[in-house]
Amino acid sequence: MADPLADFGSNVDLTVQEILLAASQHDVPKLRRLIRSNDKDGNPANVKDPETGFSPLHAAIAACEPDEAQTETNGVNGETSSASTEQKSLVQSAAETVKYLLQEGAIWNDLDLNDETPGCIARRLGLTELYEMIVDAGVRAELLLNRLDGYEPLSDDEDDQETGQGEDAANEPAAEEDQDGAPELVETTAADASAAEASTEGPGPDVTSSRYLDSNLTFTNDRLLDQDQNGVMMAWETEIMSRSAKKLLPTTGLRVMNIGHGMGIVDGFIQEQSPAAHHIVEAHPDVVAEMKRKGWHEKPGVVIHEGRWQDILPALVAQGETFDAIYYDTFAESYADFREFFSEQVIGLLEQDGKWGFFNGMGADRQISYDVYQKVVEMDLFEAGFDVEWEEIKVPKLEGEWTGVRRPYWVVDNYRLPLCKFMD
């Protein structure tokens, strides 16, 4: 077993060192004693080594990495079987340690100095059981935070003083994610924010819906950027948009609505399916102007709605408009906005046998975040009365795509294309 703590410096606080060592040795009883007896500020389950950035979760999982000597001798003179048994036992003890740390409030997506979360390490080492444990912890944390987002904090000062809890309690860093406002539902996580702060360019201004709508956009052949160089839409998404349009519109003559025109990629493919009616909701005035310049308002069946979907859709519902297909691809909106869209608006706009989809970029700048948000959205869709099917599409290598873009919003290998419909 490799020693994940071998590089610990002598300047590490003794208590921190003991906690991290106990985590790496999967010594749960000792961990429990150390954590319960800790009298320092902060959660001891989230202490960090200053030289590696390891938290106890990182240390517990990294301890399962085989050392070089063990790797070299595997398969020689029948040693594979014993090594495999030893590794299974090691992973099992790690699982117990991870379970305990999560129960104590360990942050599932904390970043080390190698820009890895505990789940990233588990995935890199092929430790599926541990990876799934971290994913499930992320799902629980995100579901909780999303629910808390819907509650107003107590405004009674006396209540706050009596309980010792005010808004700070709701702001504990128990979990991720980003918000970069979700460009095309690309969520920015707390982990990503830390990474941005460590970069040479810095994190830059927050991406909010109001800032985006007030910004000047730059249109080129292969990308659409806002004034902060955030990628609003890029040409590499073309295959995804083509497949989405064909899945939503398997036949001609259907009624469709797209929310978020951007570069017009998906709307172009929708036109190829010869819809009977093609409604487009677009909030940014620069995009609307570009649409008119390109003659979108003159295309067959096209109706352009200028404004935010939050203002447009209720009016369409009141008018009795319905659609066979709906696509959602907005920029700089939060997951809460998206949840409101499918929970409150789709039900009044989609035909009973209709289909709808969305650009699935939530957490796509880190595989574990992408996996977490797939489960989160599945649960929320189920609660709203929708079934969802996923189709995996291989994403091409994008190394050269991000030149001139503030940050890559896509790093995972496969895109999961969603197709949603009402439950039977």
From Swiss-Prot:
It is found in: Cytoplasm; Nucleus. Belongs to the class I-like SAM-binding methyltransferase superfamily. RMT2 methyltransferase family. The keyword Nucleus applies. Its main location: cytoplasm. PANTHER family: GUANIDINOACETATE N-METHYLTRANSFERASE (PTHR32379:SF1). Its EC number is 2.1.1.-. Residues 71-89 have a biased composition (Polar residues). Residues 205-424 form the RMT2 domain. One of its GO terms (molecular function) is protein arginine N5-methyltransferase activity. S-adenosyl-L-methionine binds at Y212, M241, H261, G262, M263, G264, I265, V266, E282, A283, H284, W309, Q310, D329. Monomer. InterPro entries: Ankyrin_rpt-contain_sf, Arginine_N-MeTrfase_2, RMT2/GAMT_Mtase, RMT2_dom, SAM-dependent_MTases_sf. S-adenosyl-L-methionine-dependent protein-arginine N-methyltransferase that methylates the delta-nitrogen atom of arginine residues to form N5-methylarginine (type IV) in target proteins. Monomethylates ribosomal protein L12. Residues 163-173, 187-201 have a biased composition (Low complexity). The keyword Nucleus applies. This is Protein arginine N-methyltransferase 2. It comes from Aspergillus fumigatus (strain ATCC MYA-4609 / CBS 101355 / FGSC A1100 / Af293) (Neosartorya fumigata). One of its GO terms (biological process) is methylation. Disulfide bonds: none annotated. One of its GO terms (cellular component) is cytoplasm. Keywords: Cytoplasm, Methyltransferase, Nucleus, S-adenosyl-L-methionine, Transferase. Residues 67-89, 151-212 are annotated as: Disordered.
